[in-house]
Amino acid sequence: LYSIASSAIGDFGFGDSKLDFAVSRGIDDIMVDLAAK
């Protein structure tokens, strides 16, 4: 699931690496939240 999400984000082609980092961290946080429930 994570790799699919990463691929989808990559397909959007965000040029700002800081934005990429923020988005990927956000996904990590969501995954952690889901895993904790």
Swiss-Prot record:
GO function terms (MF aspect):
ferredoxin-NADP+ reductase activity
Q: Which GO terms describe its cellular component?
A: chloroplast stroma; chloroplast thylakoid membrane
Q: Which residues are listed for NADP(+) binding in this entry?
A: S3, S24, R25
Q: Does the keyword Transcription apply?
A: no
Q: What chemistry does it catalyse, as a reaction equation? A: 2 reduced [2Fe-2S]-[ferredoxin] + NADP(+) + H(+) = 2 oxidized [2Fe-2S]-[ferredoxin] + NADPH
Q: Which GO terms describe its biological process?
A: photosynthesis
Give the metabolic or biological pathway: Energy metabolism; photosynthesis
Compartments, record wording = Plastid, Chloroplast stroma; Plastid, Chloroplast thylakoid membrane
Q: Could you tell me the membrane topology recorded for this protein?
A: Peripheral membrane protein
State whether keyword Phosphoprotein applies. Answer: no
Sorted alphabetically, the keyword list is: Chloroplast, Electron transport, FAD, Flavoprotein, Membrane, NADP, Oxidoreductase, Photosynthesis, Plastid, Thylakoid, Transport
According to the UniProt entry, the coiled-coil residues are none
Name its co-factor(s). Answer: FAD
Tell me its EC number(s), please: 1.18.1.2
The family note in this entry says:
Belongs to the ferredoxin--NADP reductase type 1 family.
Task: State what this protein does.
Answer: May play a key role in regulating the relative amounts of cyclic and non-cyclic electron flow to meet the demands of the plant for ATP and reducing power.
The protein in question is named Ferredoxin--NADP reductase, chloroplastic
Q: Which species expresses this protein natively?
A: Imperata cylindrica
